[in-house]
């Protein structure tokens, strides 16, 4: 049975503290799954952003609200994306460029994001169609999806040309807390999760 320890959800442009030095926020998504969970991790000299939301103007406006009200006088110092899907890395380029800060991702996720962020509607190829047909997708549903496909590039800001590679079992020390990096697969090529034993907190992104 699932237990939900926090009854109050973050308001748009605001955070909820889930553990000392860990803030939870949400960004809206224009789909049936209507939001994404993101996090701020407090370091001694600034904040790490974990996942970014889609590359939409509305998302940037909500980030501006976060910057105005939730940083407690500290700057943003790094962006970490758990994986390459647009709702998780769509604003990474904008954030890194705005604050001149580094991007942290696993190798497989970074380079997949670089490739997929160049996709347009013209990249909906026969191989894509064959895959979904063989997976059993109904023809009418497939045609609807194809008609609405605009490519990752429409919702991903241009990614930085360099990044810090995250590898399985390494540790990041953020604000005196050691976060272990776990690399998963299935949902995406090399999905990053962060775990703090001291806080008993797992930031799992979309990894199940």
Task: State where each predicted segment sits.
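Divalent metal-coordination and catalytic microenvironments
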Residues: 21, 41, 51, 83, ...
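Conserved beta-strand hairpin/beta-sheet module of binuclear metal-dependent hydrolase folds
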Residues: 12-74, 194-207
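Short beta->alpha connector loops
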Residues: 29-32, 56, 84-86, 185-187
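Short, solvent-exposed coil/turn elements at secondary-structure transition points
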Residues: 28-30, 109, 168-169, 187
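Conserved beta-strand segments of alpha/beta enzyme cores
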Residues: 23, 102, 178-180
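Metallo-beta-lactamase
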Residues: 47-57, 152-156, 161-164, 171-173, ...
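Short glycine- and acidic-rich boundary segments immediately preceding or forming the N-terminal edge
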Residues: 1-16
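Active-site HxH/HxHxD metal-binding segment of metal-dependent hydrolases
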Residues: 58, 64-173
């Amino acid at each position: 049975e699932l237990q939900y320890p926090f009854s109050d959800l973050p308001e748009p442009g605001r955070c909820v503290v889930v553990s000392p030095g860990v803030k939870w926020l949400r960004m809206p998504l224009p789909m049936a799954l209507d939001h994404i969970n993101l996090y701020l991790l407090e370091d001694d000299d600034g904040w790490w952003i974990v996942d970014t939301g889609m590359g939409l103007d509305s998302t940037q406006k909500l980030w501006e609200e976060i910057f105005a009200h939730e940083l407690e006088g500290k700057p943003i110092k790094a962006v970490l994306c758990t994986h390459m899907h647009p709702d998780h890395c769509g604003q990474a380029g904008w954030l890194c460029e705005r604050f001149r800060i580094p991007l942290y991702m696993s190798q497989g996720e970074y380079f997949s994001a670089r490739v997929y962020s160049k996709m347009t509607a013209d990249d909906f190829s026969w191989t894509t169609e064959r895959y979904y047909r063989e997976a059993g997708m109904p023809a009418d549903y497939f045609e609807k999806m194809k008609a609405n496909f605009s490519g990752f590039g429409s919702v991903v800001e241009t990614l930085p040309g360099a990044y810090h590679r995250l590898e399985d079992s390494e540790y990041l020390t953020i604000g005196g807390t050691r976060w272990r990096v776990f690399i998963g697969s299935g949902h995406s090529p090399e999905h990053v999760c962060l775990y703090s034993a001291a806080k008993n907190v797992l930031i799992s992104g979309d990894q199940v």
